[in-house]
Amino acid sequence: MNLLIRAAAIAALLHITPVVVLVKRPDAVQALLPGADAYVAREVHLSGTDAHRLHEAVDWSPEDGVLVFYGGTAGSTSVGALEFVRVDTPHGPIEVAVGFTPQGAVRGVVVTKATVEMKPWVLEAVAAGLTDHYRGLKPGGEAPAGAAGIASRAGNLAVYVAGEVDKGVARALAAYGAFYNHVRA
């Protein structure tokens, strides 16, 4: 009985709700790689040293030590690349798609998944202009500051989730800057 009570208490503390799709991945790809008519997925399997370097830079290690970049082309011309990044929060995971121009700047950001609990916060943050604050960022440049950018126009929980999106964008910038050129065709 004591074990059952402890399990219930832990479950109450870890009140993670189901994940919902806010934007389907194919729709995010089309939005972030406009005009592309061909796509390729490229995996980068990180060595222990590379994984440690990424973890030190942005406190993150990709699942199974593998980064996946999606490139888009229109004919023979590169349209850009994107990466889907998962951010684990106390309220459950969110997934952020970060698209890059061929010049390496952030083209756009789309929050593709969140938990049922966080969905209204994400929608409020996006409505307050969150994703506009990431355009033009480059690896090694300014840190993502979307949360600070919407602080005066959104509630505390929307600003909180914006900070989590900032983490996802920072992780994508670090991964793209350090590893994308090694796999570009």
Regions found by a protein language model. Name each.
Residues N2-E95, T101-A185:
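Intrinsically disordered terminal and processing segments
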